[in-house]
Amino acid sequence: MLVLLIVFFNSYYTHCSHHSLYSFHCTPPDPAMKQSPLHRPSRPLLALGIEGSANKLGCGIISHSPSPTGGPTLVMVLSNVRHTYITPPGEGFLPSDTARHHREWVVKVIEEAVRKAGVRMGDLDCIAFTKGPGMGTPLQVGALVARTLSLLHNIPLVGVNHCVGHIEMGRQITSSHNPIVLYVSGGNTQVIAYSQQRYRIFGETLDIAIGNCLDRFARVIGLRNDPSPGYNIEKEAKKGKRLVQLPYGTKGMDVSLAGILHSVEAYTKDKRYRSWDQVNDVEEDIITPYDLCFSLQETTFAMLVEITERAMAHVGAKDVLIVGGVGCNLRLQEMMGIMASERGGRVFATDESFCIDNGIMIAQAGLLAFRMGNTMPLEKTGVTQRYRTDAVHVAWRA
């Protein structure tokens, strides 16, 4: 693999399969707010980000440029390429198999990202990679490639916390200033608020993450993993007609989801349950897979809305930013929107290009850290599977 990288990265690159150019102006600071210590760049800065903490392998290139008019920094997404490891229905993804996928695709994904951005490796100011949290062996693939590129081209390295990447990309795209953040994905469920250069965790799952809960139930009822189990649950939930009783596990601002998963799985052994090929319009007292998808979503999402509202009340926030793969779910956005509007606030969310794991969010967070002078020596670039969100010093925010 190292030989492939050396041969490949000494050449010039340019196109990729699916990409749009995004351009954003940073929102001008409110004079009443504390001023960010982040200075405007004196020249265009480029960062390449590599993400591979789970089954998504992503690479993106972002630029931060001074505004020609002297206004806020201009942020441009130059490329955002992703390849997903998809397993057969009923199967999850193992770390070793996922790492094998990443090793097979990493050169191709980076090649597409660099070619699409229309830049050379020598143009980059820093290389950012996901340091954690995530699955160990897939994380190591991204870190190894980042180190190799750094050594080949003498480019500084920045290790990025996966969750902070989600938050910073979400803030950039939506122009949300200081919302409560609901971070919901396959490996994480956290309610977060910013304070004193840390993203503070106010509540989280006590056992499994919401995305893991949905994915595991999708496997039980035989849903496909393409494009993702959670998306397929969302689609089938729209056909549900019956809300079955499930335990409701909120504890303060924390949630417990393992018991709900066990309970909804138990309904598949109920004598009233009819599998996909047995559903008909004749029987009345039946439970269908559609009903279970609907019930699981409604119950778990109600819990997420409740703990988010508690955090909002605690810190006096009006707005919510939903990040992470489950944040793409339109029903979750709708339920959160109802709650936020009742409090006179708003919900911010992104589309699948940015809410699902991607390399551009790592590039964004990495470039923010780089602009504050934060880089990593090679010996500090090991991965951290349990890298807490609140362990990161967010030096670029006031």
From Swiss-Prot:
Its cofactor is a divalent metal cation. Keywords: Activator, Acyltransferase, Cytoplasm, Metal-binding, Nucleus, Transcription, Transcription regulation, Transferase, tRNA processing. Its EC number is 2.3.1.234. GO terms for molecular function: chromatin DNA binding; metal ion binding; N(6)-L-threonylcarbamoyladenine synthase activity; nucleotidase activity. The keyword Thylakoid does not apply. It is found in: Cytoplasm; Nucleus. It is an enzyme of class 2 (transferase). GO terms for biological process: positive regulation of transcription by RNA polymerase II; telomere maintenance via recombination; tRNA threonylcarbamoyladenosine modification. Gene3D superfamilies: 3.30.420.40. GO terms for cellular component: chromatin; cytoplasm; EKC/KEOPS complex; nucleus. InterPro entries: ATPase_NBD (IPR043129), Gcp-like_dom (IPR000905), KAE1/TsaD (IPR017861), Kae1_archaea_euk (IPR034680), Peptidase_M22_CS (IPR017860). Component of the EKC/KEOPS complex that is required for the formation of a threonylcarbamoyl group on adenosine at position 37 (t(6)A37) in tRNAs that read codons beginning with adenine. The complex is probably involved in the transfer of the threonylcarbamoyl moiety of threonylcarbamoyl-AMP (TC-AMP) to the N6 group of A37. KAE1 likely plays a direct catalytic role in this reaction, but requires other protein(s) of the complex to fulfill this activity. The EKC/KEOPS complex also promotes both telomere uncapping and telomere elongation. This is tRNA N6-adenosine threonylcarbamoyltransferase. It comes from Cryptococcus neoformans var. neoformans serotype D (strain B-3501A). The gene is KAE1.
